[in-house]
Amino acid sequence: HLTPEDVVILPAFGLTLQDFENLKKIGCILVDTTCGSVLVVWKRVEKYAKDGFTAVIHGKYTHEESRATASQVERHEGGKYIIVRDMEEGELLFDYIAKRPGHLSREAFMEHFANKASKGFDPDADLEYIGVANQTTMLAKESLAIGWKVHEAFVEHFGEEHASTHFRSFGTICSATQERQDAVADMMEDSPDVMLVIGGYNSSNTNHLAHLCRQHTATFHVEDAACINIDTGSVLHKP
């Protein structure tokens, strides 16, 4: 059990609003290392909730950062969010907004996004006003594409004038993440024979970099130097 004498270091991806409030109640000494880029996203999502906009968050709903970001809507009564993992899942959202032929029924939509949306989420009422944000370590191009597709669906169903007042978007990719993704893209213009990507197997950043590299050349994702055995000439890497 934590006590007021304990020192708690808040991670770079932040904590959910509820967890943060619980720590404050205990009176722990808090060392907040939440990344500045993450805080920017939080402020944007909170503003969406304040203005009555549902936050569409491009991210992994199981990731600590996405959960912390989504929780920021709770600062305002009635705040809503829905988390979309990738473009494939995004298509379910786009089709529902635009009411395209074959779109999911309300029940099927709710079932699919049951664990990825705010409590009491109603797709027929809560997709009238939308603001787009993202987990800061997602692929930048995909985040931008998802935002554009949401806007496109709005225009298709409601018209351009409606979209201009009911849709908001804001680029929230971490600058360091963007720089690394851009660097990989530049390197792949003259693809090397092999790429070695070093980082945690559970790191969203590192996994995205490895994914980008695999599209062009043989890629090995390793956690650290211990994964490379010089004597045997073998590499222990993520499949």
Briefly describe each language-model feature range.
Residues 1-239:
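The feature marks the mature, well-folded catalytic cores of soluble enzymes
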